[in-house]
């Protein structure tokens, strides 16, 4: 395997200098770039020379819709919603959903909540709404004895979690026989340290296209290897870029070693276990590339177990 690594900087001129090198036209796959303004010229180059282009960072850009060789790893959230809805109704077929609305509406989750309500309606799943100031008694009145009660805030912000967690915790403690969960969003993993005990007590779920935990064996092994190679610790950003790079590189290099030019016809057979970021590629249209529609559910059980649910 021949591996070429370049610093493309921030400017298109720097990228063009790299693309002018003779070896660039012979690549099997190119990973990058980091900066948005470099994506189109790199996509044009990859398309002209029939080279796979894996875009790991940006959620923006139209290149994936008109270049069949583009793979977009970091998919816009709206493209994942249908996957979340399908996984949700499969995980909770006997659900009663109780939406918790903030006093000031959060437009960021409006599309997700609207789509989820329509999916619940289509599946005949009952639902109702309370506001963020609901007391324990109000929350109890919303419960169904014959259902799995799922509370879903209509905002992903930490300020709403801080507001509702105390009342939900009291509710769960006073109604131990009831089946109650709290369901939320990818950004909740950044609040986990603040609310860890509550997450376990409330049997919390949230969805995400990436997740890892320092207790997972694969993550421990990777972290130790990273420290050995680079004599520094991993950053605490979400997602972790080092793990993103490893998962992405491993997927495509393994795929090319297995299937070569037939990789695109065998993507569904690539059942690798990632450290952080999973892959489920779907072609966007007949003339476009692939977006990553992989979604996990992360569960904090009452037995203090952390479970990463994979639905494929």
Regions found by a protein language model. Name each.
Residues 1-312:
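Extracytosolic ligand-binding ectodomains
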């Amino acid at each position: 395997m021949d591996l070429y690594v370049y610093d493309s900087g921030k400017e298109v001129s720097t990228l063009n200098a790299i693309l002018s090198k003779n070896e660039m036209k012979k690549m099997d796959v190119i990973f990058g770039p980091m900066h948005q303004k470099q994506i189109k010229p790199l996509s044009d180059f990859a398309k002209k020379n029939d080279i796979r282009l894996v875009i790991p960072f940006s959620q923006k850009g139209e290149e994936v819709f008109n270049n069949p060789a583009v793979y977009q790893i970091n998919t816009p959230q709206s493209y994942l919603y249908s996957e979340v809805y399908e996984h949700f109704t499969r995980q909770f077929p006997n659900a009663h959903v109780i939406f918790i609305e903030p006093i000031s509406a959060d437009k960021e989750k409006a599309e997700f909540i609207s789509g989820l309500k329509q999916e619940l309606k289509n599946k005949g799943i009952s639902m109702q709404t309370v506001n963020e100031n609901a007391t324990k008694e109000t929350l109890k009145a919303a419960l169904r004895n014959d259902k799995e009660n799922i509370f879903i805030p209509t905002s992903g912000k930490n300020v709403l979690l801080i507001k509702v967690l105390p009342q939900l915790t009291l509710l769960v403690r006073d109604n131990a026989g009831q089946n109650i969960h709290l369901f939320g969003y990818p950004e909740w993993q950044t609040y986990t340290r603040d609310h860890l005990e509550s997450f376990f007590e409330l049997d919390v779920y949230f969805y995400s296209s990436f997740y890892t935990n320092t207790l997972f064996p694969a993550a421990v092994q990777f972290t130790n290897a990273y420290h050995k190679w680079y004599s520094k610790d991993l950053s605490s950003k979400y997602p972790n870029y080092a793990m993103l790079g490893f998962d992405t590189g491993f997927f495509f290099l393994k795929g090319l070693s297995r299937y070569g030019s037939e990789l695109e016809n065998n993507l569904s057979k690539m059942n690798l276990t990632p450290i952080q970021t999973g892959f489920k590629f779907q072609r966007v249209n007949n003339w476009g590339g692939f977006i990553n529609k992989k979604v996990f559910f992360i569960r904090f059980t009452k037995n203090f177990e952390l479970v990463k649910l994979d639905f494929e």
